[in-house]
Amino acid sequence: MSRYRGPRFKKIRRLGALPGLTSKRPKAGSDLRNQSRSVKKSQYRIRLEEKQKLRFHYGLTERQLLKYVRIAGKAKGSTGQVLLQLLEMRLDNILFRLGMALTIPQARQLVNHGHILVNGRIVDIPSYRCKPRDIITVKDDQNSRTLVQNLLDSSAPEELPNHLTLHTFQYEGLVNQIIDRKCVGLKINELLVVEYYSRQT
């Protein structure tokens, strides 16, 4: 299944706020109206919607998300929490959380077009897994820096999560540590996502 490129508001109206996909928010009460017209959700549908929420927020294909679930399942610790850590430490998501892009798809474009360096080297793979002490910088090029400066100016001021530091004037971000669960930027029940996949096998 390919990455979603359809109407974004349609997704957030059904699944709730997906800040990585779009800065728009569903209107207050729209979910309640939808629920009043529909029958009670099955457990399968509840798990499916949590999975879809994760997939659309981080901009993943079904195959990519399944791969991350399998990696998380083999790691030590809670599969759900490891899954969120893997997704949050992707380079495209780190740029989004730093405010260098308004959405994750926008961050992905910055990476694909060679505007971003990690530890002094251009990285053009959005799924690159960042590690503690990684230094993310914008290429020392007028076009790259003007582009990112415009995005920084456009982004709503939000408190940075503890695992990141931003040096705006140097166009530089620092990964301090692996993200804590409480700093994940999406309202999600990751256990339902793990359950969804465990029941598919």
From Swiss-Prot:
It is found in: Plastid, Chloroplast. Residues 89-152 form the S4 RNA-binding domain. It comes from the Eukaryota. Its main location: plastid. InterPro entries: Ribosomal_uS4, Ribosomal_uS4_bac-type, Ribosomal_uS4_CS, Ribosomal_uS4_N, S4_RNA-bd, S4_RNA-bd_sf. GO terms for biological process: ribosomal small subunit biogenesis; translation. Coiled coil: none annotated. Keywords: Chloroplast, Plastid, Ribonucleoprotein, Ribosomal protein, RNA-binding, rRNA-binding. GO terms for cellular component: chloroplast; small ribosomal subunit. GO terms for molecular function: rRNA binding; structural constituent of ribosome. PANTHER family: 30S 40S RIBOSOMAL PROTEIN, SMALL RIBOSOMAL SUBUNIT PROTEIN US4M. HAMAP family: Ribosomal_uS4_B (MF_01306_B). Belongs to the universal ribosomal protein uS4 family. One of the primary rRNA binding proteins, it binds directly to 16S rRNA where it nucleates assembly of the body of the 30S subunit. With S5 and S12 plays an important role in translational accuracy. Part of the 30S ribosomal subunit. Contacts protein S5. The interaction surface between S4 and S5 is involved in control of translational fidelity. This is Small ribosomal subunit protein uS4c.
